[in-house]
């Protein structure tokens, strides 16, 4: 099997392709590397001006080495093999969007550090319990959540009450699974 691509190699390729210097760039796309990236190594710390980083469609297992990315607002890690959210604390003060769908995340420990997170796309992961889902209530800015394809969502959607149950637990959401959240208090008063 081919050796994994390192972040350093991927950045060299990206610089050649775009003609930009990685340490000056505000948006860096390292998605779908062949062979795939397996580790978020220390080379990431050179991306001091990066606001949008895409590492999706690789084989990354752990979030790491984000400490130099003082301006990071959008992090895309979809379609990897990430099992937990450890490592995000380095960007907890700046990150506004985390795209982490199609991974292996079961527990949301560590999400509470994301004080500015507005958008969380984490469909098709392995979250099974309300106890984990409730950790999202620690995110004061979260307004847009995609959670479809997690065992918890699938179970409650099958019963027809996912949206109601999820929005009851996260009342500040404006969008859930791509749909605007409609508050239902007014509608239920006239029903018997």
UniProtKB/Swiss-Prot annotation:
GO terms for cellular component: cell projection; cytoplasm; dynein complex; microtubule. Its main location: cytoplasm. LRR repeats lie at residues 49-70, 71-92, 94-115, 116-137. Pfam families: LRR_4. Gene3D superfamilies: Ribonuclease Inhibitor. The keyword Repeat applies. InterPro entries: Leu-rich_rpt, Leu-rich_rpt_4, LRR_dom_sf. It comes from the Eukaryota. Residues 150-192 form the LRRCT domain. It is found in: Cytoplasm, Cytoskeleton, Cilium axoneme. Keywords: Cell projection, Cytoplasm, Cytoskeleton, Dynein, Leucine-rich repeat, Microtubule, Motor protein, Repeat. GO terms for molecular function: alpha-tubulin binding; dynein heavy chain binding. GO terms for biological process: outer dynein arm assembly. Part of the multisubunit axonemal ATPase complexes that generate the force for cilia motility and govern beat frequency. Component of the outer arm dynein (ODA). May be involved in a mechanosensory feedback mechanism controlling ODA activity based on external conformational cues by tethering the outer arm dynein heavy chain (DNAH5) to the microtubule within the axoneme. Outer (ODAs) and inner (IDAs) dynein arms contain the molecular motors that generate the force to move cilia by ATP-dependent reactions. There are two mechanosensory systems that monitor and respond to the mechanical state (curvature) of the axoneme. One system involves the central pair microtubule complex and radial spokes and the second system involves the outer dynein arms. Belongs to the dynein light chain LC1-type family. PANTHER family: DYNEIN AXONEMAL LIGHT CHAIN 1, NISCHARIN RELATED. Interacts with DNAH5, a outer arm dynein heavy chain. Interacts with tubulin located within the A-tubule of the outer doublets in a ATP-independent manner. This is Dynein axonemal light chain 1. The gene is dnal1.
């Amino acid at each position: 099997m081919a050796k994994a691509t390192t972040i350093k190699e991927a950045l060299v390729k990206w610089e050649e392709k775009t003609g930009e210097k990685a340490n000056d760039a505000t948006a860096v796309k390292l998605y779908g590397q062949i062979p795939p990236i397996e580790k978020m190594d220390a080379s990431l710390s050179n991306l001091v001006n990066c606001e949008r980083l895409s590492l999706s469609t690789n084989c990354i297992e752990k979030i790491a080495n984000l400490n130099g990315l003082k301006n990071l607002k959008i992090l895309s890690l979809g379609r990897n093999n990430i099992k937990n959210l450890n490592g995000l604390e380095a960007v907890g003060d700046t990150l506004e969007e985390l795209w982490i769908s199609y991974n292996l995340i079961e527990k949301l420990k560590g999400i509470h550090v994301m004080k500015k997170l507005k958008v969380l796309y984490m469909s098709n992961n392995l979250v099974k319990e309300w106890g984990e889902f409730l950790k999202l209530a620690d995110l004061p800015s979260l307004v847009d959540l995609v959670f479809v394809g997690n065992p918890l969502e699938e179970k409650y959607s099958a019963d027809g009450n996912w949206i109601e149950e999820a929005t009851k637990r996260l009342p500040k959401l404006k969008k859930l699974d791509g749909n605007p959240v409609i508050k239902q208090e007014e509608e239920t008063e006239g029903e018997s």
